[in-house]
Amino acid sequence: MQSGTVDGLYHEVHGGPASDRQTVILSAGLGGSGTFWAPQMQALMSRFRVVLYDHRGTGRSARTLTDPHTVAAMGDDIVKLMDALGLERAHVVGHAAGGNAGLALALNHPDRLDKLVVVNGWSRPDPHIKRCFDTRLALLNDTGIAAYVHAQPLFLYPADWLSANNARLEAEEVHHINGFPSPDVMRTRIQALLEFDIDEDLETIRCPVLVSASADDMLVPLSCSRRLAERLPNATLDIAPWGGHGFTVTAPEAFNAAVLNFLSGEAA
């Protein structure tokens, strides 16, 4: 594994030279940390060179944001990372905010993208998503970082999985609090997501897209993924029956298989 920081973006490269294998770039959700993808690494590394990174303002990356900070800027950061690594093209797998960044990349830099996987993403503001983000912001603003972090599993995971894995979640909570971005960074990232709207441009995105969603996601309605799949010209919709917003964590085996099949050209 090689790691480094370019233009403020911490990243890791897992696998051999780009000449030996195709490269997959993993882009996390609102939290921004590349460690989110731990349940996917072994499966993806069996066939691909894997690059993960921490979003700007989060994790081990620079804690300052671009101004203005938009989802398009998040997509531009992927291009900056590719440029630094000498990658002309790559596959991108993105969860929620990271999936939206992938859509922005596909729209603004189509020549840099091979295939895109959008996990629990959306193309326009949604009332349910806004209500969830408003609630998270109220927790952050009114009660602080610890309360915000403590509440996150309620948005991410099914209730039965949360109950069964509570000890694990409590152990992770201290780490998440210690590594939390500044409240201003989190507010700005949420605002960028609430303003993201490329709905009228979806038909211009021509690359193959796997739209991956969980039927019981309580943060992003399934209708958002259905809309993406209906309006993107070259999209495939894959719906997990269970797993919540973070089904990449709660049900990784089926997700990993679907992504590998899609990226390898084996999807039906």
From Swiss-Prot:
HAMAP family given in the database record: RutD
> Which stretches make up the AB hydrolase-1 domain?
24-243
Q: Which GO terms describe its biological process?
A: acylglycerol catabolic process; nitrogen utilization; uracil catabolic process
Q: Which UniProt keywords apply?
A: Hydrolase
Q: So what EC number does this one have?
A: 3.5.1.-
Top-level taxon: Bacteria
Q: Name one GO molecular function term.
A: hydrolase activity, acting on carbon-nitrogen (but not peptide) bonds, in linear amides
Q: Which gene encodes it?
A: rutD
Q: Which family does it belong to?
A: Belongs to the AB hydrolase superfamily. Hydrolase RutD family.
Q: What is this protein called?
A: Putative carbamate hydrolase RutD
> According to its record, what are the GO cellular component terms?
membrane
Task: Fetch the InterPro entries from UniProt.
Answer: AB_hydrolase_1 (IPR000073), AB_hydrolase_fold (IPR029058), AB_hydrolase_sf (IPR050266), Pyrimidine_utilisation_RutD (IPR019913)
Q: What does this protein do?
A: Involved in pyrimidine catabolism. May facilitate the hydrolysis of carbamate, a reaction that can also occur spontaneously.
Q: What is the species of this protein?
A: Caulobacter sp. (strain K31)
Quote the Pfam families the UniProt record gives.
Answer: Abhydrolase_1 (PF00561)
Top EC class, one word: hydrolase
Show the catalytic activity: carbamate + 2 H(+) = NH4(+) + CO2
